[in-house]
Amino acid sequence: MSEEQQTQPQLALERLYTKDISFEVPGPQVFTKQWQPELNINLSSSAEKIDPTHFEVSLKVVVQANNEGETAFIVDVTQSGIFLIDNIEEDRLPYILGAYCPNILFPFLREAVNDMVTKGSFPQLLLTPINFDAEFEANLERAQTAVEGQA
């Protein structure tokens, strides 16, 4: 490999996998009631350095559907990817791990959630697309405002 190729920025998804998945229907009585669910959706992301050039990025979602005051189902999915990240400016790393990689993972997470819910014999559940770039920028602004407020 030439020296120029060794210094070129590299960013690639090398492995995509479901790290954790569960689906629970606490009671069969939910199937006898009219379906008008209230959804509680919690989404989070995390990143872990595996070695100098590889990171595991994970998106986790927990969805709890309540119907007529009872839990209809709980679905918990963690979708992960191993990303090769090399020769990238250090100041770009938070954006890549906090927005770029989650944008890649989200469609797979969304599909896994929908599959679990429909296999549980509930109506389709398609999570609304998320703009992780905008979320990342908003988090930066909140952090900067908090720091300025302490000064």
UniProtKB/Swiss-Prot annotation:
It is found in: Cytoplasm. Keywords: Chaperone, Cytoplasm, Protein transport, Translocation, Transport. InterPro entries: SecB (IPR003708), SecB-like_sf (IPR035958). This is Protein-export protein SecB. One of its GO terms (cellular component) is cytoplasm. GO terms for molecular function: unfolded protein binding. It comes from the Bacteria. GO terms for biological process: protein folding; protein tetramerization; protein transport. One of the proteins required for the normal export of preproteins out of the cell cytoplasm. It is a molecular chaperone that binds to a subset of precursor proteins, maintaining them in a translocation-competent state. It also specifically binds to its receptor SecA. It comes from Acinetobacter baylyi (strain ATCC 33305 / BD413 / ADP1). It holds the Pfam family SecB. Its main location: cytoplasm.
